[in-house]
Amino acid sequence: MNLKRTMFASGLVILIAASLAACGTSNDSENMSENGNAKQTIKVGSKDFTESLVISEIYADALEENGYIVDRVQNIASSVIPQSIEAGEVDLYPEYTGTSLLTIFDLPLETDPDKVYDLVKKEYEKNGVLTVLDYAQANDSAGIAIKTSVAEKYNIYTISDLQKNADKIRFASQGEFDQREDGLPGLKEVYGSFAFKSSTVYDNSLKYQVLLNDEADATPAYTTEGQLSNKDEFTILDDDKKFWPPYNLMPVIRQDILESNPEIKTIINNINKDLDTDTLIELNAKVDIDGEDYADVAKEYYESIK
């Protein structure tokens, strides 16, 4: 082989290798932590409904903005995701304080938000694997929605008001709500009997349309549903006797991830401090009512608060 060609080829290989190394150093520097170590890939999980998808995407956007690589692990069933994070399949995901209290840990009912948070935080940290970050004021709890016109007509703004005026109200119920202890039977124990003018069972997906069609006046609801953004049509009643526990949005994270990436606490807590119930209603409405893509909604919201 020609010696000059051999030397040229060898030099070219060295030059290419050096260039690739330089490029790698440049890219890696964007994903370096403050102590000089490369930032980890963070697996951000979500449950299989709009609100969880939007919030987890906001978390992911914030982490990427701060130099992390994010692996999105989406649409996990609510019953499965606690095991997923324990197993390391997920590093971080948005959970709810009430779900943690009653479903995950099967603890006694508590309605004070701070007490609920303290109780579940202690449970998450027991095995040294998980912990939680600050909870948001946003509360995705059970509730009762009423037509705003009816609320104004009869001065009904709390569940106590509803109980006193039940004989004027056509109730659009759902099958399980009539039997479950966290539904009508439990409400009766706390508020007294609800002698509705009428009560008809409808499919959950039809409840707001039933109210709009003037077939009923009130219905079981969740307090962050997108339809509630239409305040001219719908009003959520205040649970004035605190029958339902709070379901404040709360990030669950693996302790090992937080220990090796402590800045994640500040990144995610900065998001949660601005999240209130009305904000969640608006975010859900953009996806479920307006038909926007959840990732676009999350990106737009994150850009507005960062």
Predicted regions: what is each one?
Residues 50-69, 85, 90, 185-189:
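Short, polar/charged alpha-helical segment
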